Amino acid sequence: MESRFIKAERDTKLKLNYDAGNIISPKVHSVGVLALGSYLENHGPVLPIDTDIKIASYLALNASIKTGAKFIGTVYPATEYPYVKHGIHVSVKDLIENIVSIMKLANKYIGIDKSVIVNAHGGNLPLKKHINVIERETGMKIVMNNKIVEIEGPHAGSGETSLGYVIGIADVERMNEIDFKKYPEIGMVGLKSARKLNKKIDEGAKIVEKEGVKINPKLGRKLLNIALNDIINDIKHLIRMDKNETK
């Protein structure tokens, strides 16, 4: 699948400076980094409803800056387990269609042929089973990075709130408004169906019930660094794959 970008470069005999700038390899220009989170989801009074996509975007853009890979934007919709009621979401099928559309445009206009999807929303985890569908539809190699979801802890808990504080989206003055009855989505403490049907959600809710929600800047920075390094490793892995395929 030849992109419009590659055809234009060939037809005009234009030579782009692929080796310019602070990049890890000239081959990194064919790697896209796409942020996936959730734009419409309650996180209590301290964090905004688009917390997940802002965390994903922060990580994706910083990984792009540190490696030279191309930040190709954000995915608008998100999916969720049917028993988790704290936001507005779509089906996995609709999510896949949206991602495929973005990937095809990235290939067509800027020559992206492999991508890392940086996910910061636990409800998007079912997408992992369908990455092969996206690869088949786009002709790309796709890696889905869920590291921040794996390490941040319960929804709107201390980990995620600390992340939000570090990147500048938390309203610290509203910490005293945290109330599990008024904001049942915090730690998913008040989401009874979700707790009943998902053991991990229930375990996380119990931790938040016991320990509350606290802001720890050191923890927030640590979580961001772990996730960022993991994303960078995925980008490097895709470049190595590209080198192996061209041997």
Curated annotation (Swiss-Prot):
Its cofactor is Fe(2+); Zn(2+). It is an enzyme of class 3 (hydrolase). Fe cation 2 binds at H43, D52. Pathway: Cofactor biosynthesis; coenzyme F420 biosynthesis; Cofactor biosynthesis; riboflavin biosynthesis. Requires one Fe(2+) ion for activity. The keyword Transmembrane does not apply. Fe cation 1 binds at E41, D52, H121. GO terms for molecular function: 2-amino-5-formylamino-6-(5-phosphoribosylamino)pyrimidin-4(3H)-one formate-lyase activity; ferrous iron binding. Keywords: Hydrolase, Iron, Metal-binding, Zinc. Its EC number is 3.5.1.102. It catalyses: 2-amino-5-formylamino-6-(5-phospho-D-ribosylamino)pyrimidin-4(3H)-one + H2O = 2,5-diamino-6-(1-D-ribosylamino)pyrimidin-4(3H)-one 5'-phosphate + formate + H(+). GO terms for biological process: F420-0 metabolic process; riboflavin biosynthetic process. Homodimer. Catalyzes the hydrolysis of the formamide of 2-amino-5-formylamino-6-ribosylamino-4(3H)-pyrimidinone 5'-monophosphate (FAPy) to form 2,5-diamino-6-ribosylamino-4(3H)-pyrimidinone 5'-phosphate (APy). PANTHER family: 2-AMINO-5-FORMYLAMINO-6-RIBOSYLAMINOPYRIMIDIN-4(3H)-ONE 5'-MONOPHOSPHATE DEFORMYLASE, 3-DEHYDRO-SCYLLO-INOSOSE HYDROLASE. Belongs to the creatininase superfamily. FAPy deformylase family. This is 2-amino-5-formylamino-6-ribosylaminopyrimidin-4(3H)-one 5'-monophosphate deformylase. It comes from Methanothermus fervidus (strain ATCC 43054 / DSM 2088 / JCM 10308 / V24 S).
